[in-house]
Amino acid sequence: AFSGILAEADIAAALKACEAAGTFNYKAFFAKVGLTGKSADDIKKAFFVIDQDKSGFIEEDELKLFLQVFSAGARALTDAETKAFLKAGDSDGDGAIGVDEWAVLVKA
């Protein structure tokens, strides 16, 4: 799903670092997976991979399964992790993360 954008080894390392429930930190994950240093175009491409229902927004249910987009065997985020992730990215308070909010969140 992320071929040509992110390296498999970086994805594996980023997932390993947050295997335990409650240890997910979006800033650390974005940095480890190599997304932070990517071009605006690649960051947008990643958004559209994560936006599973193609609504143009990443909603709470998609955030909960965020890690599984990177690897099917990964865990779901806890409710607390999901809500913190959403709160960090949803700057306009509409309950979802749009593509522009995503770009800001990745570079935060």
Curated annotation (Swiss-Prot):
Gene3D superfamilies, per database record: EF-hand
Residues covered by the EF-hand domain = 38-73, 77-108
Q: Which UniProt keywords apply?
A: Acetylation, Allergen, Calcium, Metal-binding, Muscle protein, Repeat
Q: State where Ca(2+) 1 binds.
A: 51, 53, 55, 57, 59, 62
SMART domains noted in UniProt: EFh (SM00054)
Gene Ontology molecular function: any one:
calcium ion binding
Q: Which residues carry this modification: N-acetylalanine?
A: 1
Signal peptide residues on this chain, from the entry's feature table: none
Q: Which PANTHER family match?
A: PARVALBUMIN, PARVALBUMIN ALPHA
According to its UniProt entry, the function of this protein is described as: In muscle, parvalbumin is thought to be involved in relaxation after contraction. It binds two calcium ions.
Any idea what this protein is called? Parvalbumin beta 2
